[in-house]
């Protein structure tokens, strides 16, 4: 036998190579182009290797997708999710009503809390359940929650179930009604053939025919109809709500030959609305009293009824407000944030014989006026401050009380009875109230203008106790290093519900220069200095005020004064995360401080040292942690 040829030997080697590598994920190749599209080619010197990519299996020359979902332990989908195989990988899919959360698997989606996910009716309440949600119609309404409407008799006092679009809703018929303005409904109009077969629902009569139904039997062949319909009963007063009456039709000598049930309500504007139904026969139509055309009592207040006198309608005080004893005169007191308002009811004053009302406070320059917001009252207003209008301030440890006296007369001169009404408003002491009632608090203030939301004022003050209700007063404070400083910042004006006051950097310097390179940070980058155990941040970025405390200290070296500075920021709670997240022992370098947003307070002098306030130079040296003295400061910021 001769020697095997080189070609035959090469074929054997190649075949052996394929057999050896077929069972592995890696194969040697001559060129990278021989590798499968889902393989990675590696060239190492003279060897070219094909390796299947992650998620695929094969020898590199041929790679097929690995189904991780079918192999135990090959995927990390949670038990409540489904594994879906994808080319080279897999994905975990949650069932409807759930969302994939890292580390938690599939968690329930609260469709009620996220806009656009629930499709409940506007009146319905969304109730979240695991994997879905429910829609519940309110009490008195019927429906499946995706559609809700009221049912007759289910609405509250003074309300009725009325059409609104394609649904029925509970509403006040004084606002939800249609109008009838036909002049021929007047009882003075002659015969005709009108028939109210199409009337159903709440209506108000307006126009030249009259504003209310006739209350007496109407002669036949009037109101442009054959058998006129009139209201068999009196109209209700506004405090009676919705009442039921009978409308009678006059024909053939009978004032009530036919009848229909109607409902009537007296409205605050001095008019009436009627829930009418189609009459039982034709030709029948509802008639109006022509005397109600003029003087329709549109100006009647809620304390008055619309009454007819000699064919003319006018406003008349309700019987409930008639009093004969001055001691029964009621007054309404409103204690506002900045002023106090005391009011007396006009109807009660009229019943006591006050045709004219002269009312004033201890300072007679503060006199009464007709309340524009409520025609039933005459009012007088005084600022909630000590002094204006004769207002007197008294305070204790918990409250500040402003008091004054209201004087009442029916003439500009008084000979006999001098009527006095003492009134007072008490306000719980907080940072704002305590500063307002202090004679000369140490305060720093800053004005801030935020585009579209108005002007804000930020104040900073130093308080004596952890209640933050006793501010230090005067231009400077002297304290020992054993004392604690209680520092409060507060925001006034503008939309306080939207913005939170955030103290970004609060620090002390030995001089009045806020840019002094020697700084001791109490709050830095929104977080307290954790190396000082005496620092306590009570509130920051949570509301319209901020509070922190620290033990008094002094700077090492020849420094006896401490000045406090706070950089503040108005945080938009609708678009920003305002409350700082602070944890661990960190003390960062911080960002550049915006001096236009810095409140400055001081000096605070170490007890036993005579203060020299005129020093304003920058100071270099070491800080010895004793603890800082603080005064109140006020700052004004402008944001464009």
Curated annotation (Swiss-Prot):
Disulfide bonds join 32-41, 35-50, 52-63, 69-83, 77-92, 94-106, 112-126, 120-135, 137-148, 150-161, 155-170, 174-267, 195-282, 217-255, 223-287, 248-256, 297-306, 300-315, 317-347, 335-425, 366-389, 506-566, 527-582, 571-578. Residues 454-465 are annotated as: Internal hydrophobic patch (IHP). It is a lipid-anchor; GPI-anchor. Residues 334-429 are annotated as: ZP-N. The record marks 587-588 as: Cleavage. Residues 586-589 are annotated as: Essential for cleavage by HPN. SMART domains: EGF, EGF_CA, ZP. A lipid is attached at residue 614 (GPI-anchor amidated serine). Changing residue 458 to R: Leads to retention in the endoplasmic reticulum, probably due to misfolding. GO terms for cellular component: apical plasma membrane; basolateral plasma membrane; cell surface; ciliary membrane; cilium; endoplasmic reticulum; extracellular exosome; extracellular space. Keywords: Cell membrane, Cell projection, Ciliopathy, Cilium, Disease variant, Disulfide bond, EGF-like domain, Glycoprotein, GPI-anchor, Immunity, Innate immunity, Lipoprotein, Membrane, Nephronophthisis, Repeat, Secreted, Signal. GO terms for biological process: antibacterial innate immune response; apoptotic signaling pathway; autophagy; cellular defense response; cellular response to unfolded protein; chaperone-mediated protein folding; citric acid secretion; collecting duct development. It comes from the Eukaryota. Residues 615-640 form a propeptide. Glycans are attached at residues 38, 76, 80, 232, 275, 322, 396, 513. Residues 150-171 are annotated as: Beta hairpin. Residues 454-589 are annotated as: ZP-C. CDD domains: EGF_CA (cd00054). Changing residue 236 to Q: In ADTKD1; causes a delay in protein export to the plasma membrane due to a longer retention time in the ER. The keyword Membrane applies. GO terms for molecular function: calcium ion binding; IgG binding. Changing residue 317 to Y: In ADTKD1; phenotype overlapping with medullary cystic kidney disease; causes a delay in protein export to the plasma membrane due to a longer retention time in the ER. N-glycosylated. N-glycan heterogeneity at Asn-232: Hex7HexNAc6 (major) and dHex1Hex7HexNAc6 (minor); at Asn-322: dHex1Hex6HexNAc5 (minor), dHex1Hex7HexNAc6 (major) and dHex1Hex8HexNAc7 (minor); at Asn-396: Hex6HexNAc5 (major), dHex1Hex6HexNAc5 (minor) and Hex7HexNAc6 (minor). Glycosylated Asn-232 interacts with E.coli adhesin fimH. Other complex glycosylation sites may serve as binding sites for proteins from other bacteria inclduding K.pneumoniae, P.aeruginosa and S.mitis. Proteolytically cleaved at a conserved C-terminal proteolytic cleavage site to generate the secreted form found in urine. This cleavage is catalyzed by HPN. It is linked to Tubulointerstitial kidney disease, autosomal dominant 1: A form of autosomal dominant tubulointerstitial kidney disease, a genetically heterogeneous disorder characterized by slowly progressive loss of kidney function, bland urinary sediment, hyperuricemia, absent or mildly increased albuminuria, lack of severe hypertension during the early stages, and normal or small kidneys on ultrasound. The ZP domain mediates polymerization, leading to the formation of long filaments. The core of the filament consists of interlocked ZP domains which assemble into a helical structure. Each ZP domain consists of an N-terminal (ZP-N) and C-terminal (ZP-C) region connected by a flexible linker; the linker allows the ZP domain to wrap around the ZP-C subdomain of the preceding subunit. The heavily glycosylated N-terminal part of the protein (containing several EGF-like domains) forms branches which protrude from the core and are involved in pathogen capture. This is Uromodulin.
């Amino acid at each position: 036998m001769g020697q095997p040829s080189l070609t035959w030997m090469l074929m054997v080697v190649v075949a052996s190579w394929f057999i050896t590598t077929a069972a592995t994920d890696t194969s040697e190749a001559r060129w990278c182009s021989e590798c499968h599209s889902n393989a990675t080619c590696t060239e190492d010197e003279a060897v070219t290797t094909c390796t299947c990519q992650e998620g695929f299996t094969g020898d590199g020359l041929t790679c097929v997708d690995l189904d991780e979902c079918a192999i135990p332990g090959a995927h990390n989908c949670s038990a409540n999710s489904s594994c879906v195989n994808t080319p080279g990988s897999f994905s975990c899919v949650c069932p409807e009503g759930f969302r994939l959360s890292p580390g938690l698997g599939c968690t329930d989606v609260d469709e009620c809390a996220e806009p656009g996910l629930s499709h409940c009716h506007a009146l319905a309440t969304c109730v979240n359940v695991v994997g879905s949600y429910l829609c519940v119609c309110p009490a008195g309404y019927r429906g499946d929650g995706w559609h809700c409407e009221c049912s007759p008799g289910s609405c509250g006092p003074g309300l009725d179930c009325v059409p609104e679009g394609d649904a029925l809703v509970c509403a006040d018929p004084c606002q939800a009604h249609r109008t009838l303005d036909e002049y021929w409904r007047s009882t003075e109009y002659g015969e005709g053939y009108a028939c109210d077969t199409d009337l159903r629902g709440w209506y108000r009569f307006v126009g030249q025919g009259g504003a209310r139904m006739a209350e007496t039997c109407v002669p036949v062949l009037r109101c442009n109809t054959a058998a006129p319909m009139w209201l068999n009963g009196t109209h209700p007063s506004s405090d009676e709500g919705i009442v039921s009456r009978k409308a009678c039709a006059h024909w053939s000598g009978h004032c009530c030959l036919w009848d229909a049930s109607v409902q009537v309500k007296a409205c605050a504007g001095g008019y009436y609305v009627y829930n009418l139904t189609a009459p039982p026969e034709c030709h029948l139509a509802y008639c109006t009293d022509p005397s109600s055309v003029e003087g329709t009592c549109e100006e009647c207040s809620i304390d008055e009824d619309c009454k007819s006198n000699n064919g003319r309608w006018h406003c008349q005080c309700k019987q409930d407000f008639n009093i004969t004893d001055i001691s029964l005169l009621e007054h309404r007191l409103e204690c506002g944030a900045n002023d106090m308002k005391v009011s007396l009811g006009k109807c009660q004053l009229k019943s006591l014989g006050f045709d004219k009302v002269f009312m004033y406070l201890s300072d007679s320059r503060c006199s009464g006026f007709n309340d524009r917001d409520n025609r039933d009252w005459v009012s007088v207003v005084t600022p909630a401050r000590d002094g204006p209008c004769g207002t007197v301030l008294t305070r204790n440890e918990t409250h500040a009380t402003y008091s004054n006296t209201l004087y009442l007369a029916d003439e500009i001169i008084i000979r006999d009875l001098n009527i006095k009404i003492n009134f007072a408003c008490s306000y719980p002491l907080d940072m704002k109230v305590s500063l307002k009632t202090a004679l000369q608090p140490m305060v720093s203030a800053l004005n801030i203008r935020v585009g579209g939301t108005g002007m804000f004022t930020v104040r900073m003050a130093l308080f004596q106790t952890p209640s933050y209700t006793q501010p230090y007063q005067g231009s400077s404070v002297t304290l020992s290093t054993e004392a604690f400083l209680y520092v409060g910042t507060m925001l006034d004006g503008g939309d306080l519900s939207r913005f939170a006051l955030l103290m970004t950097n609060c620090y002390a310097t030995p001089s009045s220069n806020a840019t002094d390179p020697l700084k001791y940070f109490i709050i830095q980058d929104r977080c307290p200095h954790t190396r000082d155990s005496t620092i306590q941040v009570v509130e920051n970025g949570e509301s319209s005020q901020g509070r922190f405390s620290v033990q008094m200290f002094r700077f090492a070296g020849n420094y006896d004064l401490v000045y406090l500075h706070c950089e503040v920021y108005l945080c938009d709670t609708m678009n920003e995360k305002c409350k700082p997240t602070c944890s661990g022992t960190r003390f960062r370098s911080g960002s550049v401080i915006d001096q236009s947003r810095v409140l400055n307070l001081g000096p605070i002098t170490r007890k036993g040292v005579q203060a020299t306030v005129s020093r304003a130079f920058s100071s270099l040296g070491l800080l010895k942690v004793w603890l800082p003295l603080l005064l109140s400061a006020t700052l004004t910021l402008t944001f464009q």
